[in-house]
């Protein structure tokens, strides 16, 4: 799988594998993972024990279709995932940056979720 990737993607995949060895979500403290592309942002909250997604937000959803993958959109996506988590009475998560550097859009999603009241 890594042979077909570019150098930049290969480095991200190596970071992702290294991070996922240590990061594991449970029902009490699920894993919040961020995916970003050049155009969109997607955030999922995953219970790894049950192998299920508890909540998700994406710029592909009808309410956020005008947003793109930039810092201001990342803040809005983070606040929305925070609201959805608090509705389900989940206030603590483990943040999984999914191999991306903790900078820009990824950091904005985390800040938005913290602003909504989620702890990690």
From Swiss-Prot:
GO biological processes: translation
Transcription regulation as UniProt keyword: no
InterPro entries reported in the protein's UniProt record: Ribosomal_uL18_bac-type, Ribosomal_uL18_bac/euk
Domain of life: Bacteria
Keywords linked to the UniProt accession: Ribonucleoprotein, Ribosomal protein, RNA-binding, rRNA-binding
CDD domains with a match to the protein in the record: Ribosomal_L18_L5e
GO MF entries: 5S rRNA binding; structural constituent of ribosome
A GO cellular-component term linked to this record: cytosolic large ribosomal subunit
Assembly behavior: Part of the 50S ribosomal subunit; part of the 5S rRNA/L5/L18/L25 subcomplex. Contacts the 5S and 23S rRNAs.
UniProt-listed HAMAP family: Ribosomal_uL18_B
Function: This is one of the proteins that bind and probably mediate the attachment of the 5S RNA into the large ribosomal subunit, where it forms part of the central protuberance.
Family from the record: Belongs to the universal ribosomal protein uL18 family.
Protein name (database record): Large ribosomal subunit protein uL18
